[in-house]
From Swiss-Prot:
Organism: Yersinia pestis bv. Antiqua (strain Angola)
UniProt entry keywords in alphabetical sequence: Cytoplasm
Protein's name according to its UniProt entry: PF03932 family protein CutC
Cellular compartment(s): Cytoplasm
InterPro entries reported for this sequence: CutC-like, CutC-like_dom_sf
Keyword Cell membrane (UniProt): no
NCBIfam families: PRK11572.1 (NF008603)
GO CC terms of this entry: cytoplasm
Domain of life: Bacteria
Molecular function as annotated in GO: copper ion binding
Family: Belongs to the CutC family.
Any Pfam family: CutC
Keyword Cytoplasm: yes
Length: 254
C-alpha cells in the first residue's frame, strides 16, 4: 500500500498526524523557508510523544543547498544528535556549485548517519541532471528521494516522477512524490505507481490570542499575519489515508 508521510512544522502537528493515521512524519520548523532543522527541544519532545517514525530534516538555513564549511559541520553535528536520540531516519541533501550531488559530503553524511534511514530531500529538484543524481544517490544507498519531479509542484512533474519510478523498479531509492500533493490529486500519483506520498495536509489556523497588537510584525514582510499559523489538518490526513487504504490491492480484493 502507498505510504503517507506528513510534513509537520511542530510537535503539535506531528501528534495530530499520528492520531489521524499518517505512516511517518517529516519534522521541520520554518515553513516560510521551506523547512529547516527543528530545535533540540522539539526533537526531544517528538521522541517522547510521537510513536510513528519521525524523520527530522537537517537543513541549517533556507535558500540553496551548497553549504559553507560551518554549515556543513553544523549539519553533521545535528545528524549525530538525531542519531543518538534514537530517531528512525533523517532528511538531508547537499549539492555542489554546479548543481550536482556533492558526493564527498554526502559520503560523510551517510557515515555520520549510521543506522538512520536517509531521505534525500528536494535538493534533488535543483540538480542539473536528475538521472545522474538518481544513480549517485543509489550508489550512496540513500533510502528514498523526496521530489516534485523538478517542477514547482509534483503534479506538473509527473512525467519525470514516472521515469524515476521506472528506473528504480527493481532496485534503488524509493521515489516519494512531494510538493502540492493533496487529497484532490493524490490518485494521479497512486495510478503512476508511486509508493510513497509526502504532504503537509494542512490549513491556516487563527491565533488563540485575544489581544492583538496592530501595526507590528516579527517579520520583514509586513503583510504576514502574526495571528495565524499553519497546522496539519487531521481530517485531511484521515481522508488521504482512507483513499490509500481503499486503493490498496488488499482492499480491492475484499
Amino acid at each position: 500500500m502507498t505510504k503517507l508521510e506528513v510534513c509537520c512544522y511542530s510537535v503539535d502537528c506531528a501528534q495530530i498526524a499520528e492520531k489521524a493515521g499518517a505512516d511517518r512524519v517529516e519534522l521541520c520548523c520554518g515553513q516560510s523557508e521551506g523547512g529547516v532543522t527543528p530545535s533540540v527541544g522539539a526533537l526531544m519532545q517528538a521522541r517522547e510523544t510521537v510513536t510513528i517514525p519521525v524523520h527530522p530534516i537537517v537543513r541549517p538555513r533556507g535558500g540553496d543547498f551548497c553549504y559553507s564549511s560551518n554549515d556543513f559541520t553544523i549539519m553533521k553535528n545535528d545528524i549525530a544528535r538525531i542519531r543518538d536520540l534514537g530517531f528512525a531516519g533523517v532528511v538531508v541533501g547537499v549539492l555542489d556549485t554546479d548543481g550536482h550531488i556533492d558526493m564527498p559530503r554526502m559520503r560523510e553524511i551517510m557515515s555520520v548517519s549510521g543506522s538512520l534511514v536517509v531521505t534525500f530531500h528536494r535538493a534533488f529538484d535543483m540538480c542539473q541532471n536528475p538521472m545522474i543524481a538518481l544513480k549517485q544517490l543509489a550508489e550512496l544507498n540513500v533510502a528514498r528521494i523526496l521530489t516534485s519531479g523538478q517542477q514547482q509542484n509534483a503534479e506538473l512533474g509527473l512525467a519525470l516522477l514516472k521515469d524515476l519510478v521506472a528506473a528504480t523498479k527493481d532496485q534503488g531509492p524509493i521515489i516519494m512524490a512531494g510538493a502540492g500533493v493533496r487529497l484532490t490529486n493524490m490518485q494521479k500519483f497512486i495510478d503512476a505507481g508511486i509508493r510513497e506520498l509526502h504532504s503537509s495536509a494542512g490549513r491556516t489556523v487563527p491565533s488563540t490570542m485575544r489581544y492583538r497588537k496592530a501595526g507590528v510584525t516579527m517579520c520583514a514582510d509586513s503583510d504576514v499575519d502574526e495571528f495565524s499559523h499553519y497546522c496539519v489538518d487531521g481530517e485531511v490526513v484521515e481522508a488521504m489515508k482512507s483513499l490509500l487504504v481503499m486503493g490498496s490491492p488488499l482492499a480491492k480484493h475484499t
